[in-house]
Amino acid sequence: MESIIDRRIFFKIAATGVAGYFVSPLQTMAQTVTTTPGATIFGTARNCVFVLLAGGPSHMDTLDLRVGSWTPVDFSPTTINSIDWPNGLLPNLGAQLNSNRFSIIRSCQSLALVHALLQNWNQIARNPANATGKIAPNIGSVVALEMEAQRRPGQKLPGFLSLNGGGSLAGSGYFSGKYAPFDVSPSANGISNLNHPDGEAVFTSRYNVLMAGDALLRGTPSPIGTPVDEVSDFYTSARTMMYDPIVTNAFRFSAADQQKYGNSSFGSACVTARNVLQADLGVRYIQITLGGWDNHTNIYAPNNGIYPSARQLDAGLGNLIADLASMPGSQGRTMLDDTLIVAKGEFGRTVGNITGGGGRDHYYIHSTLIGGGGVQGGRALGKTTPDAGYVDDPGWSEQRPVYAEDIAATIYSALGINYTTVRHDDPLGRGFEYIPQNQAWLGTPITELFH
């Protein structure tokens, strides 16, 4: 059973004595790993923000614009850094593109057209239908595990934070629940569970009684087994987060920030991501989900169709990039220099004229926004045919389309993680590969982004 730690469940564990079976019943993570010599490791980023555009945005209306009779006037097409851009639809992101703060990969291709399958695929870097797909952790869980050794005293948040994850969120797979995504629905008031309704003194008294009563079960290893050990870790983690003003403030934001970021759930997630990264409390991977892109009908309907999601994306991500670029990071860099940002859907949408229902259907070709974390911005890698329907020029050394596994390898490499790692601790006994190696042509970092 794979773990996703909803924030209500997370704090409920700490406030009661119920040891639910939230984690996989497996042995302690083994340390035996192997890697392939010669892997390209960039190590240019400390953090990653991954934005899952659930539903599949129309690439030819956003990151790979094609202007035709279908194009609404208010898209206000323009050219930025020789890139055709819908400036009326995405003005804030257009300004960041003009400031060379992100680039676009236009040669991406999916291997299927099923929402749930591909959304999971993009999070676990493999086909979920394959054998290891059933046990595979989210990329964020891998990052959390790999970065755990770098954790400093006082860094109280889990390594993997999910914002607005919803039903599409992939969990920690066979990894310990310690590396599961901590899923939060952001609010300007923060996380209410950080304080107990009966007050700190009453809570502390009850918590101490709980700890004393469960002491015999909290041995290492526990006589009941690994799941209880890991639930015990949840108690401890949740307790350290409570009644800490630094943690509390990391999840709060002002009305002015809420308005600036678009006054939407996605905007709230983006400003929360900014605050959490600035607080430097141990989070190294943040996944934000923005749905609403499945525009089979009425894609250009005023204030409907593509507009709500595009406006949320523009205000939220555009301001997140701008703010990170203005904030001090490590070693004289900015927070944007420290943070790789990736935004993509599971696939694209059909090109050319719209369908009879006024929309666009699922399509293999799509685009990815990628910036910060050492990426050279202001460019478009790869090129599609004039109708945006096929990859004309892949734009990178592999001379083929870019797949989800390549994006994952790029994320790992940017964070200094060896994407060729094989962990020999999986329940299948076959070795868990961060990127599956049975298809040697998949899973290559995109070097051209960093030059």
Regions found by a protein language model. Name each.
Residues 2-451:
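Ligand-binding pockets and gating/stacking loops
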